[in-house]
Amino acid sequence: NIHELIFFELRERVRFHLEIENEQNRLKFQILELLHQTFPGLERLFSSRYSIIALNIAEIFTHPDMVLDIDKEVLITHIFNSTDKGMSMDKATKYALQLRVIAQESYPNVDRHSFLVEKLRLLIQQLKQSIHHLKQLDDAMI
């Protein structure tokens, strides 16, 4: 019967959706734990820790030394280019200045060459990919 088939398909999609959400929650927890080791305070930069822009910035600047080692203009450009939603140069500049202050005040437990810095970057990439896949699944259901 067609109704049973549709119901089955929807139920399986919802089940898979929940599995992906659970995986994302696990990744978010791991990312936050690692950030406390590699770049304490970075999570204060954005109101939404797991927005794509926040994840892009955290992926590029996984350690405060990476912020402090580049000049302000390069930092502003990285932030400006880290979202596809469009951001004003003024807002990018504001974020860059905030990020600099956070980096100066941050006391990480590991240095920039620690494996934890690389691990953090990989987990952020996994989370971004998972968010993208979930969006594709949701779009396919509509």
What are these regions (language model features)?
Residues 1-142:
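A detector of single, family-specific signature residues
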